Design a protein with these regions (language model features):
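Sequence/structural signature of small/polar-enriched beta-strand/turn repeats
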Residues: 1-205
Length: 205
């Protein structure tokens, strides 16, 4: 598309997605769920997440590829949920909600991946590096599988949304953790956080 905006009105399941219009925008629409089983490539034009969910299902070293600034997050959720390794190889990209699910290593380049909403760790998926958390972002563990926290749980944690244990899988801390002033730790009813004998420090001291 060379100009204007095309907005999706229904859910889409397809192979890859290439954004390569000279000046146009593809808007993923309102509260939809899209499943792409191939690589997402951002070359030209704009991909606007709207308020929809984009599931990236491909096992690839270029699962999210191209020029990250071609993506406008809106209030969308982008989920990397293949059963295996996936790489976010695009240049610096800002997401709203960002989900890493199913299994495998989701490879990020430090400084190239920012989340302003919820970063959700699901299943047994892990990340190679922590995303950059926006001011009001949060980290959520939403899994029924027991797991040990990884590099995604940075310390000190300064994003005001804090850290939430949201499902029945026991989350075990991997190191001592510090929460800055006014940053919460939420352990929902029926969930379990195992400190592993590491210290939790609140309020930055």
């Amino acid at each position: 598309k060379t100009s204007g905006t095309a907005t999706l009105l229904g859910n889409v399941t397809a192979g890859g997605l290439i954004i390569n219009g000279s000046a146009g925008t593809l808007n993923l629409g309102n509260a939809l769920t899209h499943n792409f089983n191939g690589v997402i490539t951002l070359t030209n034009g704009t991909l606007n997440g709207g308020s929809s969910t984009l599931n990236v299902n491909v096992l690839s070293a270029t699962a999210w590829n191209g020029t990250g600034s071609r993506f406008t997050a809106g209030t969308s959720t982008v989920s990397f949920n293949a059963a295996g390794n996936q790489t976010l190889s695009a240049s610096a990209t800002t997401f709203n909600n960002l989900t890493f699910s199913n299994s495998g290593i989701k490879t990020l380049t430090t400084g190239n991946c920012t989340a302003t909403g919820i970063v959700s760790m699901e299943g047994t998926a892990t990340v190679s590096a922590a995303p950059t958390y926006g001011t009001n972002a949060s980290l959520q563990y939403n899994t029924t599988s027991a797991r040990t926290a990884g590099v995604e749980w940075i310390t000190p944690f300064a994003a005001l949304g804090g850290v939430t244990v949201a499902n029945t899988g026991v989350i075990t801390m991997n190191a001592a953790k510090v929460f800055n002033v006014s940053v919460p730790l939420t352990v929902n009813t029926g969930t379990n956080l195992n400190s592993g004998n590491f210290q939790l420090t609140f309020g930055g001291n």
